[in-house]
UniProtKB/Swiss-Prot annotation:
Functional summary from the UniProt entry: Metallothioneins have a high content of cysteine residues that bind various heavy metals; these proteins are transcriptionally regulated by both heavy metals and glucocorticoids.
Residues engaged in binding a divalent metal cation 3: 15, 19, 24, 29
Gene Ontology MF term list: zinc ion binding
Free-text note on domains in this protein's UniProt record: Class I metallothioneins contain 2 metal-binding domains: four divalent ions are chelated within cluster A of the alpha domain and are coordinated via cysteinyl thiolate bridges to 11 cysteine ligands. Cluster B, the corresponding region within the beta domain, can ligate three divalent ions to 9 cysteines.
Annotated a divalent metal cation 2 binding sites: 7, 13, 15, 26
N-acetylmethionine found at: 1
This protein's name: Metallothionein-1A
Residues that hold a divalent metal cation 7 according to the record: 50, 57, 59-60
Keyword Cytoplasm: no
Pfam families assigned: Metallothio
Species name: Oryctolagus cuniculus
PTM-bearing positions, type Phosphoserine: 58
Amino acid sequence: MDPNCSCATGNSCTCASSCKCKECKCTSCKKSCCSCCPAGCTKCAQGCICKGASDKCSCCA
């Protein structure tokens, strides 16, 4: 378990606004931490608490 997250490491989860989990793959883009899309992908950027930049973002389709 990630001590900063309510899910097992690597599993899907919903994170709080103060999310610090690094290995978590959060399922909700707008109310959780997620890997953020490049600047051109505004869908993912809105309300997303970035935990790192990514050029592969499922929220960006």
